[in-house]
Design a protein with these regions (language model features):
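Post-signal peptide N-terminal segment of mature Sec-exported envelope proteins
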Residues: 22-43
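Residue-level detector of buried hydrophobic side-chain packing
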Residues: 41, 65, 92-94
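Mature extracytoplasmic domains of secretory-pathway proteins
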Residues: 53-84
């Protein structure tokens, strides 16, 4: 009887569509057409752009997303916010389990991970989610 209960519990857990934890959510804003974007990326490589349908990242993109998230753990835990310089076009807000990060495309002293995040967001928005190029 105990074995049947265990098997039943395993079946229910497997059929319930267990949701993978989110790696991060990014909100991009700016003063050009198409700048506004919300992107949610989960641990299994599923991405949603602007609450659209679930899309699948490639394996290299999943690795890139995880690397970016890991590299931003410390800045997020410190709730790092880098001010924009005059002439900024795009701003980014990232939230993950560790905290938040804010920066703009021209914020001075950006760590490499922030520049990688901006590139990742652009590439995934256009290549995976099929969104038009911002400013177009």
């Amino acid at each position: 009887m105990a074995g049947l209960l265990l098997c039943g519990a395993l079946l229910i857990g497997g059929c319930g569509g267990v949701l993978s934890p989110d790696l991060f959510i990014v909100q991009r804003s700016g003063n050009v057409p198409g700048a506004k974007l919300t992107m949610l990326v989960n641990e299994e490589g599923v991405v949603h752009c602007d609450n659209g349908p679930a899309r699948r990242l490639s394996d290299p993109q999943i690795i890139e997303a995880r690397t970016i998230q890991e590299d931003l753990e410390e800045p997020a835990a410190k709730h790092e916010s880098l001010p924009a310089k005059p002439g900024s076009v795009l701003s980014y807000y990232l939230r993950d389990a560790n905290g938040t990060v804010r920066f703009s495309d021209n914020s001075p002293h950006q760590p490499t991970a922030m520049r990688k995040l901006a590139g990742f967001v652009l590439n995934v928005a256009q290549g995976v989610c099929g969104l038009p190029q911002q400013g177009a």
